[in-house]
């Protein structure tokens, strides 16, 4: 028997109960402290240079958290960005991570403080009831995919009435006995094929070879060139960190002009690479500076909110 086990076995009932409470308080405190570290890492985007496309990827691939653990923590960090008091309320037990993570999906600058206040001292079920009351159209279950066997998976998600009607029609058009999984797989195959044609220039009958020359600074990337770059890069972000870690991101990839299109890079295979959004911005900062990217981000936000200079009333004179 280990010394720790011996110490526990020799404790009185009261000592065991008080020891457990103390251990749980320490666990809660250390958990909130970890969240504070994550929030600062997110603010500085420290994970980007180290080869991760997001805080979520860093938590899973860099820290070894499960996807569920990472999702909850990232959601809490984002909620705390709007309501910094979240950390203190978590530490003293007035909020719990599960509830904050659920609420985070519905928070905006206008309702964040109100939602946090309403969620104080509420159980998970009560937080879910709060969400159902405040957001009647909210999904009743979380999207998730779980392994059912070694080769099959169980999918859980909410769908619209239109999706149900499409499924019913698909069942009518397929042979009797075709299960929903087969219909779902066939529909996804068609959808993926459509997206690959649109985003990567994929086609069953390529009509041309990649261009060997193109005007400097040209924004348009021909389909044949896109196909060649995607194939060469393995449909994956090509960023490699200083310690040799290649980014694993395969979603929302962008064609980056090596050295910067604004500085004369051409839309040819040898001067293009695939980067995820985070590493494309990182590369742009390296080439054009933080100020340039900050101005672009501000301009994009202003355009979305209708506050850009092009939307202002002209001055009289």
Predicted features and spans:
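Residue-level recognition of alpha-helical structural elements
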Residues: 16, 30, 48, 96, ...
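Amphipathic alpha-helical "recognition" segments
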Residues: 52-125, 133, 148-149, 156, ...
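DNA major-groove recognition helix of helix-turn-helix
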Residues: 42, 74, 81, 131, ...
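Generic alpha-helical segment signature
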Residues: 13, 27, 31, 76-79, ...
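A boundary/linker detector
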Residues: 1-12, 18-21, 31-34, 117-317
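Secondary-structure capping and boundary motifs in well-ordered enzyme cores
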Residues: 26, 30, 47-51, 61-63, ...
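N-terminal acidic-hydrophobic amphipathic loop/helix motif that frequently occurs adjacent to catalytic
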Residues: 1-63
